[in-house]
Amino acid sequence: GNMYAILGKSGSGKTTFLSLISGLESAKEGAIFYQDKSLNQISLTRFRKHHLAIVFQAYNLFTYMTAYQNVSSALEISGEKKENKRAFITESLKSVGITEDLQHKKVGQLSGGQQQRVAVVRAMVTGADIIVADEPTGNLDEETGRDIINLFEKIAHDQKKIVILVTHDNDIAKKSDVTYELKDKVFHKRVKKLSQTK
């Protein structure tokens, strides 16, 4: 898997890009392809349920539920079957630093960084091939933001997922394998130099 960055200032087209790849909007021109098929030719409901997970800047968690319940609901909605669901969820949350005592707190009681980690686990457990994160460090302090980007990098490389970070932050883009810079709604590709990847 690889981690990609979509880098752009406000108004550059990042939100439109997110709407297009998630199937919330249709392209007026051209087409978006997934596994050699246009998104217009496949069931968008199935695509979003089985292949794409989005981590929103505002986390989009159910604040009246616990961290554990938030992840459990995502697993059920996705239809992913796990042998020992309880252990799978508990271990997935622990792997990002959400201890068992935190797992049983309502997410509204967790810090911003903890909520973002829960949102990342919600995306991970769905089995989606592609995880898109919208401004993943927008509401976080610098250190927590760095931890979240490292977590996405680990997901991309260890779990062989495609991770797409949509951001205005050049430092985040530098951590990605490939960056596409959006300027005036046009993509400009920047690949890491070999010396940077070692």
Features from the language model and the residues they span:
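Helix-to-loop junction immediately C-terminal to a conserved catalytic motif
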Residues: 22
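Short coil-to-helix segment of the ABC ATPase nucleotide-binding domain corresponding to the Q-loop/switch region
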Residues: 65-73
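Conserved catalytic motifs of ABC-family nucleotide-binding domains
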Residues: 127
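Conserved ABC ATPase "signature" region
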Residues: 83-101
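Conserved ABC ATPase signature
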Residues: 106-110, 114-116
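Conserved ABC transporter NBD signature motif
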Residues: 30-38
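ABC ATPase NBD coupling module
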Residues: 39-53
